[in-house]
């Protein structure tokens, strides 16, 4: 799961994030994430913790100390951020991307590129809270329309606009 760790995001993002986390906990999902108690990432972590769901924290050694270390059931230490991205993509059952900054975008792009290259065939879900990803989705479409990317994007990722839409992926 990738999302913002900023404490300054608007409430709409935090509310939708908490509702999504509560729904995932209902299905007893495991949280595998980049380890932060702040922002949307912290909201997800705290919701999973409160619901006694399994939490796996993946931290790069190069950033150790810059990120808050959370109380996780498992802690995985990797050498650097690029290793963290690969670990998250390769070891999760699916990737859920919520609004975030550069780290979140790196996770999204890594997930999509690895899927295109056949390294995995896992679901990638973009949670487009408040239209946050509208411009990047237009960019993806432009890549396809102008032949920079010939891959059928409908096979790469799904977009949801409300937390409740995640349920259709849980029932599979």
PLM regions and their residue ranges:
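Short, acidic/small-residue loops that bind anionic groups at enzyme active sites
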Residues: 59, 98, 114-138, 151-153
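Acidic/glycine-enriched connector segments
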Residues: 35-99, 103
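A charged, well-structured terminal subsegment
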Residues: 94, 146-172
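Glycine/threonine-rich flexible loop motifs
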Residues: 10-12, 105-108
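Glycine-rich beta-alpha loop segments
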Residues: 1-54
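Glycine-rich, charge-decorated loop segments at or immediately adjacent to ligand/cofactor-binding or catalytic sites
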Residues: 38-46, 132-144
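Short Gly/Thr/Asp-enriched flexible loops that form oxyanion-binding sites at enzyme active sites
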Residues: 42-47, 107-117
